[in-house]
Amino acid sequence: MKSKITLFIFLFFLICVKIYSQTTMELDQLIGIHNTNLVGDTIKLEVNTYNAFKKMERAAKNDGINLKIVSAYRGFDRQEIIWNKKYDKFTNEFLMEPKKAILEIIRFSTIPGTSRHHWGTDIDIIDGNYPDEKDVLKFEKFEKNGVFYKLKKWLDKNSEKFGFYLA
């Protein structure tokens, strides 16, 4: 692994499925090197997570919310690219000391090999009824008067019914 590590600058709205936490994983799967238990076309999820999401998606649609996954499974290599990109930005563009840059990055992102996205159980979602914008996962977009506030309130009330927990 490279000595530098970078993360996404925008915030993650992570959701994790409890059901998968009871499953045993191989080390390669745990750290994002290899995962064969994934389903989906362009967006990959662990099979139980996928099925739970589909149920939640149907329920949300009945309430006028169009759940759209903007990030799901990503392997070690993709996480490393993200980490390195953020690290470069913080140290080269913002001129942060390496330790300070890392501390800033880990506020919202994880070091490659430690991301729950490696498991295919975490998803970042938005309400697809609203046009995509830059940095869709910023906290303020999920707060009162934010474009995804209705989604946040719906998830607060309903996500655990489907085995998802906001993080």
Features from the language model and the residues they span:
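Bacterial Sec-dependent N-terminal signal peptides
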Residues: 1-26
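Extracytoplasmic cell-surface/polysaccharide-interacting catalytic and binding patches
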Residues: 18-167
